[in-house]
Amino acid sequence: LDEGVVPVITGFQGMNELGDITTLGRGGSDTTGVALAVALKADECQIYTDVDGVFTTDPRVCDKARLLKEVSFEEMLELSSSGAKVLQLRAVEYASKFNLPLRVLSSFQEGEGTLVQEEKNIMERPIVSGISSIDSEAKLTIRGVPDVPGVAAKILSPISEAGIEVDVIVQNISADNNTDFTFTVDKSDAKKAEDILQKTSQTLGGGSIEVDDEIAKISIVGRGMRAHAGVASKMFQTLAKNEINISMITTSEIKISVVI
């Protein structure tokens, strides 16, 4: 670089703890770019994609989606983990760890894109910055297991040991001191999870196992929600007006997700 040479470095590959060459998984080139920018102490890392930047939602799904000029690391992490595919989650985590601003730009046309950085001007933030969705999950329910301390661990431990990642979890209490336990996993893991639950149900004296792979998870994200009440209520009312039933809900300080 000091000699004016522009190096072209391949992304998507790295080295594990044993020194073996390996790949970084989906979106690994983003992570490569961020790691190099951190090592070179760059002012920002620019990620060129097939979109103009980060939108309020997927513009291919909603023609009213708006380009965001700026979004915080925290919001981008929530959006990426909830289905937004514009930036790879690990790349955002790494940039946040070293406070390296990211700029998402289009490869096909000029523009300022979207700047992802530490939160600034919180008073000017919109309540909701973005909406993301995932339709690649399945919902599994184990019926009639005893409602006793530790039952959740007994259900989820074998799932975790099988390397299956669980997303949304809901536990319901019934009148006979039994509970229905529901959670979501990636569709590719649904059959394996179902087989594990069948064995768990027999061990716990539970009932039937139900699998539903025709679901979607919708999330709204925004740091402004911390200071504003009623966001969840408005979201639920909007879904109800459109006759969309909610089967699961999960929330954090800046994110509300529903499974429909």
Predicted regions and their residues:
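C-terminal catalytic "cap/lid" subdomain
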Residues: 1-260
